[in-house]
Regions:
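Soluble C-terminal extramembrane regulatory/interaction domains of multi-pass membrane proteins
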Residues: 152-526
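Catalytic and GAP-homology cores of small GTPase regulators
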Residues: 8-13, 123, 149-156
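Cytosolic juxtamembrane amphipathic/interface segments immediately preceding
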Residues: 1-6, 46-50
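Long, low-complexity, intrinsically disordered segments
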Residues: 537-588
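Alpha-helical membrane-embedded segments
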Residues: 127-156, 166-174
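Alpha-helical transmembrane segments and their helix-start/interface "positive-inside/aromatic belt" motifs
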Residues: 2-19
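Hydrophobic alpha-helical transmembrane segments and immediately flanking/interface helices
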Residues: 89, 121-142, 200-224
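Transmembrane alpha-helix detector for multi-pass membrane proteins
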Residues: 20-35, 45-119, 140-151
Length: 588
């Protein structure tokens, strides 16, 4: 914005200098011939004056046509892309009215002088008429380039957003100035309508993946909210009770609740965010989702600082609706971003509005189990970490609702199969128990330890190993939280090791021995597999088979005594199988 302003100022300075030089040249040329203006023009002088006026009339007509074509094409097309409000803004702009009105008036004056000079042939006024027409034409010529740049800059999306924002603030000021209830309703309706125009510009930008304009729109909504909160304490009660049901498009019950809580403007802004979030999730613009979540948190903090319980309650309702959108669209990334900002909101109002923090913790628990029922149980892990962080902040600040927050956190698993041993749930309980034990909150740490004894020992050993192995404080990918959730600060590591010894019976030396034995077992298995693949096929260990003999002759067969059998036939003996030790080993 600063660079753009500097560029505009530089262009204006250069253009003003050029106009001043041109004016000086005109004065320099006219001064020696100033006495000719009072003398009548005859013959060629009259024709020259008439030709000059005709040329000026032709040029002004072309210039006016060009400006009308520019405005008639550019303004509606841009309004179709962003918002119809642009046409109203363009018509209401004073500079647009001044420039277009000047071109129309200059055309009329020049055309009138051209016609009158041709009809009357006035010799005395010919030169002054021509001079006036030339002056009007020169001013029009010099204003074309600056006005063209002004129109193009008028159509920039950031400019549109800024103008609509000023319209909203002006409507809020009118709401405070008016005393008539009917006029107050009209001012409130204008403010809500302009807020919806801001939301429409942001929505179109998100659909077109225009993140810059979307960020400008969200920033404008936040600034409008801040301006309204600054003026709200000075508004009359009748203005705060004004109704705007048709503009918001809400049901009668919710509209009555909004009027009772005096949160019409707040709900109008939150309703626009509620329309923007599903679109941002669908087009996969994660930055916009994060900005919407952060903006909602900022709105909630501002109303909580003012003690506006009604508006703060509406913020929590819309936060819950956002979480529902993330679950319906099955967007884990959006759910993570929203839960993170929701937890930060509850953490920031722990001291000023502890009841609100407790409600937020309940809602986080509720939507975590909704995720489990919808087939996304892994989302419960991140909720467990956030509830643990909220409990840690509550015990650190010693707020009176800290025990209820801890009870909500402990009851998060509900002893349900598949949730009791969720890795994130177990890790969050271990880390929080270690931190509370280190800070001297033994009763809360004991409750968590008794809860952890329900977890199978194998799961506990693996979980403790993962926590102790997390040495890096920050996560190795781009994430909103930035911090590694499993990382434990060095001040709490001793408490983690002590807790592991109590729960699993394994101390540091035992863990090292177990790790060494596990590594040795794996190496032995690997060596066995490798040896089996490379070893030659062993020779069977049975008795050496007899050498093959020549078959007996006919005479030898006749002389051979008959075997002792009932039929006198010789039984053919079947070869016996080799002993098991002589069988080759099966290939692994």
């Amino acid at each position: 914005m600063k660079t753009r302003t500097a560029t505009s100022a530089g262009f204006a300075a250069i253009w003003t200098l050029l106009c001043a030089v041109l004016l000086a040249l005109l004065i320099f040329d006219l001064l020696p011939h100033f006495e000719l203006l009072t003398q009548p023009a005859r013959g060629d002088a009259l024709r020259e004056a008439s030709n000059a006026i005709t040329a000026c009339s032709r040029f002004l007509g072309v210039a006016l046509s060009m400006l009308v074509a520019l405005c008639a094409l550019a303004i509606p097309l841009t309004a179709n892309v962003y918002t119809p409000k642009l046409i109203e803004l363009f018509v209401a702009d004073r500079l647009n009215r001044l420039v277009i009105g000047y071109f129309v008036l200059a055309n009329a004056v020049v055309l009138w002088n051209d016609v009158m000079l041709g009809l009357s042939g006035a010799e005395v006024a010919a030169r002054p008429r021509a001079l006036v027409c030339v002056a009007l034409t020169l001013v029009a010529l010099l204003s074309i380039a600056p006005y063209l740049l002004y129109v193009l800059r008028f159509l920039v999306p950031q400019s549109i957003v800024g103008r609509i924002q000023r319209e909203v603030v002006a409507s809020i000021d009118d709401l405070g100035d008016e005393t008539d209830p009917a006029e107050q309703d009209q001012a409130l309706r204008r403010a809500v309508t302009n807020i919806q125009y801001l939301g429409k510009v942001t929505l179109r930008s998100i659909q077109r993946h225009d993140r810059d304009v979307a960020a400008e729109g969200l920033q404008a909504l936040e600034e409008v909210f801040q301006a309204y909160q600054t003026r709200k304490p000075y508004l009359s009660p009748s203005a705060l009770r004004s109704s705007c049901r048709d503009a918001l498009g809400l049901g009668p019950e919710l509209s009555l609740e909004i009027e009772r809580k005096q949160a019409v403007i707040e709900v109008a802004i939150l309703a626009e965010l509620n329309l923007l979030l599903p679109v941002a999730i669908r087009v996969e613009v994660g930055e916009v989702v994060a900005q919407i979540a952060a903006l909602t948190r900022h709105l909630g903090l501002r109303v909580a600082e003012r003690g506006d319980a009604g508006a703060a309650d509406m913020v929590t309702l819309y936060f819950n609706t956002f979480l529902r959108h993330a679950l319906k669209t099955r967007s884990p990334d959006s759910f993570y971003k929203l839960v993170y900002q929701y937890r930060r909101f509850a953490e920031n109002v722990l001291e000023s509005a502890p009841q609100l923090s407790e409600r937020v913790a309940f809602f986080l628990d509720y939507y975590a189990h909704q995720a489990v029922r919808m087939g996304m149980p892994y989302l419960l892990n991140v909720v467990a970490y956030d509830l643990a962080a909220l409990c840690e902040a509550a015990y650190e600040r010693k707020v009176h609702c800290r025990k209820r927050l801890l009870d909500l956190f402990i009851a998060l698993d509900r002893d349900e199969p598949g949730i009791l041993d969720m890795p994130g749930m177990v890790k969050a309980q271990i880390i929080l128990s270690a931190k509370l034990a280190t800070t001297g909150v033994e009763d809360a740490a004991g409750l968590l330890e008794s809860e952890l004894r329900k977890v199978p020992e194998e799961v506990l050993r693996e979980t403790f190993g993962q926590i102790i192995a997390a040495r890096e404080e920050n996560f190795w990918e781009i994430a909103d939280r930035r911090r590694h959730l499993d990382h434990v600060e060095p001040a709490y590591r001793k408490a983690v090791r002590d807790l592991r010894k109590r729960l699993t019976g394994v101390d540091e030396a035992g863990v090292a021995t177990m790790l060494f034995m596990e590594e040795a077992r794996k190496e032995a298995q690997l060596a066995a597999r490798k040896g089996t693949r490379e070893a030659p096929r062993p020779t069977p260990r049975g008795p050496k088979p007899a050498a093959p003999q020549e078959p007996p002759s006919e005479a030898e067969r006749e002389e051979a005594p008959a075997e002792s059998s009932g039929s006198g036939r010789r039984e053919r003996s079947e070869p016996s199988p080799p002993p098991p030790s002589s069988l080759p080993p099966r290939r692994a």
